[in-house]
Amino acid sequence: MKAFTTLQGLVCPLDRANVDTDAIIPKQFLKSIKRSGFGPNLFDEWRYLDHGEPGMDNAKRPLNPDFVLNQPRYQGAQVLLARENFGCGSSREHAPWALDDQGFRVVIAPSFADIFFNNCYKNGLLPIVLAADIVDQLFQECEAAPGYSLKVDLAAQTVFTPSGQAFLFDITEHRKHCLLGGLDEIGLTLQHADEIKAFEARRRVEQPWLFA
């Protein structure tokens, strides 16, 4: 998993509330269990003018010119700005996979669905909850200023605007530790590799019948 420390990232404003996981990555693309390759189908039903299916050449599909991801000023965005209850609906880890594959490292919203929120942390994506009035302000600033970017400092748990405003956000120490170190659940386990090996060696001596 990629470590997250600080990010200065272009912001893409998705001005929709209650964006569910089927909108983030439609169900027909869930057959793959690889974590890569989902970016071109992120927000597929809004992004393209036709119906997407696995195996289609996305480069040849007609784009929806009104959708934010297709607008030149938001190309290369790493921060997604969203409205309340982002990531609601069915549980699918493919949703943060698709956001990550598109290049997003941070999602900022007033609230998130619980399962999506937890899945983000497991996949190196930082979901940040800010008050609705602050999110409103960020939308206004982003839409008014092409090239609008935010600095996110995870160690300081702070979002900085171009004007220098600072907004604190909450995160548990455990999740912060994992993101700063780029540690998923396997990585956390491997931090205790020596203790695990010592336990297994001790068990072979104390309970040899288990290994006969």
From Swiss-Prot:
Pathway noted in the entry: Amino-acid biosynthesis; L-leucine biosynthesis; L-leucine from 3-methyl-2-oxobutanoate: step 2/4
Enzyme class: lyase
Keywords assigned: Amino-acid biosynthesis, Branched-chain amino acid biosynthesis, Leucine biosynthesis, Lyase
Keyword Cell division: no
Cellular compartments per GO CC: 3-isopropylmalate dehydratase complex
EC number(s) per entry: 4.2.1.33
GO molecular function: 3-isopropylmalate dehydratase activity
Reactions accelerated catalytically: (2R,3S)-3-isopropylmalate = (2S)-2-isopropylmalate
Keyword Lyase carried by entry: yes
GO biological process: L-leucine biosynthetic process
Protein origin, superkingdom: Bacteria
NCBIfam families the UniProt entry points to: leuD, PRK01641.1
PANTHER family reported for this sequence: 3-ISOPROPYLMALATE DEHYDRATASE SMALL SUBUNIT (PTHR43345:SF5), 3-ISOPROPYLMALATE DEHYDRATASE SMALL SUBUNIT 2-RELATED-RELATED (PTHR43345)
Cross-referenced HAMAP family: LeuD_type1
Family indicated by similarity: Belongs to the LeuD family. LeuD type 1 subfamily.
Record function comment: Catalyzes the isomerization between 2-isopropylmalate and 3-isopropylmalate, via the formation of 2-isopropylmaleate.
Binding partners and assembly: Heterodimer of LeuC and LeuD.
Record-given protein name: 3-isopropylmalate dehydratase small subunit 2
Gene that produces this protein: leuD2
